[in-house]
Swiss-Prot record:
Subcellular location: Cytoplasm
Binding partners and assembly: Tetramer of two alpha and two beta subunits.
Protein name: Phenylalanine--tRNA ligase alpha subunit
Cofactor binding, note field: Binds 2 magnesium ions per tetramer.
Taxonomic source organism: Photobacterium profundum (strain SS9)
GO molecular function annotation: ATP binding; magnesium ion binding; phenylalanine-tRNA ligase activity; tRNA binding
Record's keyword terms, sorted: Aminoacyl-tRNA synthetase, ATP-binding, Cytoplasm, Ligase, Magnesium, Metal-binding, Nucleotide-binding, Protein biosynthesis
InterPro entries given in the database record: aa-tRNA-synth_II, aa-tRNA-synth_II/BPL/LPL, Phe-tRNA-synth_IIc_asu, Phe-tRNA_ligase_II_N, Phe_tRNA_ligase_alpha1_bac, Phenylalanyl-tRNA_Synthase, tRNA-bd_arm
Ranges in coiled-coil conformation: none
Protein family membership: Belongs to the class-II aminoacyl-tRNA synthetase family. Phe-tRNA synthetase alpha subunit type 1 subfamily.
Amino acid sequence: MLQLDEILANATTAIETAASLVALDEVRVQYLGKKGELTSQLQSLGKLPPEERRTAGQEINKAKGAVQQAIAARKDALQRAELETKLAAETIDVSLPGRRIENGGLHPVTRTVERIEQFFGELGFSTESGPEIEDAFHNFDALNIADDHPARTDHDTFFFNPDLMLRTHTSGVQIRTMEHGKPPFRFIAPGRVYRNDYDQTHTPMFHQVEGMLVDENVNFAQLKGILNEFLCNFFEEEVEVRFRPSFFPFTEPSAEVDVKRKDGKWLEVLGCGMVHPNVLRSVGIDPEKYSGFAFGMGVERLTMLRYGVNDLRSFFENDLRFLKQFK
């Protein structure tokens, strides 16, 4: 009992000097725990004479209450200090200059595809898609491409095996769409295509948009009118357009379409023609009843012309200095 004042003084000092909640809890255990010093004092009351026990018990409980209050007060102070430190660390200096958040922008190729889709969508053309890994029937056979055509060689096409390849055009989408429907058809097919070529004007992967219209009494004059209107709309000016006779296995007659540049030179921008009867037959459509036209354009080529880009490879190098120009 004679140690009670000393225990209380030591406990008070330990509580006041506890620098953290963990240290404070250690003090609590030391004095108030099951084996704590004040708890031991209570347990030793039985050794005192009966007449002294009550007074001693009251003194011990009084000391115990004082320690509990001191611990509670110190705990509250430590928690407030911890919160203040945390808030101070999270304080925002409103006088600091703000961080500029860069706005993203559409890739120029995406812009071109969306512009093409919008124009033809207004003419009633739907947008179709298909697999990028294509079989020989949809990529070559159904399109009237002969077995000895150069496109069937490894020099032009990425083959997985003789009957499976990365598609070289989106024409396969035209075949698949006609296979699963009945005329009339009016759609475009944008997408990635692959050819074994890489230089200033060619990349192994590029984008194409092909279009097709199949119905009764479709003629070449309608094709010319639509493409002429499209090119003027795309370049946002009246451009001079010419159609040159050409050859494509899947169209007959066929033509290449050129636009006249400001320097007076002609530049090819797309190919087109009337759908070959063999293509219609390959999907079970009677060429005596139905006719159609088809066209195809390289998206990167049109994008280069629209924005004055000289090297097609710039579109795929992810150089932000280049891409920021198109925001």
